[in-house]
């Protein structure tokens, strides 16, 4: 099956990343960036433009956007790993930067500085060093692990950071508070309304008595959501069991263990490790009659029964808008509040719903009072552009 083949490929990418290939790609990018930079310098010299760095973009805060017409800003985008949610975010960051660039008469040059760490901490640290050496004007890390590395890498050079899809920026020690980050960093958060997901779960199955919590203990994005889930289930008198994993293989084993436990349902927050593995576990869960409730619409796209959470397309656009505010409009990240989203949209996978033996129309009617909208999807590898 197409989706199964892809999940195996993802697993190989995550667990056996060829670092030499990454280095060669990095060298190629640097050579291309150098050639493009030389050409751009010659071109802009004639019209008085040029590329900025973190210092000059801060110095330009007092200038109007019109005065910056013709400038080129180097934007480093660091995607933590490849999966539908983060792919959608990066795609929308790029498209919004392109649109804003045309609108403002400036260029946001991200292509030579976009890199994907594929979930490998060593590679992500290497990417951080490369972006600092490239003297980019801003770094945009996507997901908590990437944001933590980029924050550390920019502490001394003061390159501003605008993160995307960080579930709990305060607990991750990226910001002092959501309203006043306090450092040279701000961004967008995909903080999860855990209680809302469990309301959907218990509405669809009022007799739900045993819930599996499936996540990666090493993912900061899961920490608070799992704590909230336990508190909710304890208060509701619902028994739960935790199963964790740090790789696709381990998540597969954890899912099989939950099937053997005969849980009534499974909950996963906005966990990147489980998201990467979803295509390889959704069929076995559905065939076992276990609905999987998750914290991002990409889970439902990849086969989970239901998700409730952030619209990642809008989150990507908002992240790009914040990048523009910092670079062009001179906003200080330290005083720019972290943006959060709560669109109240539940996404139901109609194919999985059928496999589970659930009545889609009944589910939609039951979910309607609890959501602003109920969206239908079918299993696919990625969102259509």
Which residues does each predicted region cover?
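Hydrophobic alpha-helical segments within soluble ligand-binding/sensing domains
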Residues: 68-69, 168-210, 310-331
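Bacterial signal peptide processing site
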Residues: 48-51
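Short beta-strand elements in bilobed, periplasmic/extracellular small-molecule ligand-binding domains
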Residues: 101-124, 184-185, 232-248
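Beta-alpha junction/loop-to-helix N-cap segments that form part of ligand/metal-binding clefts
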Residues: 112-176, 271-286, 290-295
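An alpha-beta-alpha
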Residues: 75, 93, 186-236, 332, ...
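C-terminal motif of bacterial Sec signal peptides marking the signal peptidase cleavage site
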Residues: 42-46
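Hinge/cleft segment of the Venus flytrap/periplasmic-binding protein
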Residues: 19, 325-385
